[in-house]
Amino acid sequence: MSKEDVIEVEGVIKEALPNATFQVELENGHVVLAHLSGKLRMHFIRILPGDKVTVELSPYDLTRGRITWRKK
C-alpha cells in the first residue's frame, strides 16, 4: 500500500487506551481505533482526550488508523 492509497480525516480524541492507542471520533461521527505514528512516538508528543488530530485510514480497514498530526 502506498501513501496515495491512504484516506486522511480529521477527528477528536475520545479516550486514551493502553499501548499508545486511542479512540478517535471522526468528523462524520464514526469512532475508530488509532495508534500513534513513529514520528509522534519518537518525539514524545503527548496526546490527550479532546485533542484534534489528523488520522490516516487504510481503504482496506476503515475501523483502524494511524494518528499522524496533533493540531495546536
Swiss-Prot record:
Instruction: Spell out the subcellular localization from the entry.
Output: Cytoplasm
The keyword Cytoplasm belongs to this UniProt entry's keyword annotation: yes
Q: PROSITE patterns, alphabetically? A: S1_IF1_TYPE
Xref: CDD domains:
S1_IF1 (cd04451)
Family in the record: Belongs to the IF-1 family.
Function summary: One of the essential components for the initiation of protein synthesis. Stabilizes the binding of IF-2 and IF-3 on the 30S subunit to which N-formylmethionyl-tRNA(fMet) subsequently binds. Helps modulate mRNA selection, yielding the 30S pre-initiation complex (PIC). Upon addition of the 50S ribosomal subunit IF-1, IF-2 and IF-3 are released leaving the mature 70S translation initiation complex.
Which key words tag this protein in UniProt?
Cytoplasm, Initiation factor, Protein biosynthesis, RNA-binding, rRNA-binding
Q: What SUPFAM superfamilies does the record point to?
A: Nucleic acid-binding proteins
Give the protein name, as stated in the record: Translation initiation factor IF-1
Q: Which PANTHER family match?
A: TRANSLATION INITIATION FACTOR IF-1, CHLOROPLASTIC
Could you tell me one molecular function GO term of this UniProt entry?
A: ribosome binding
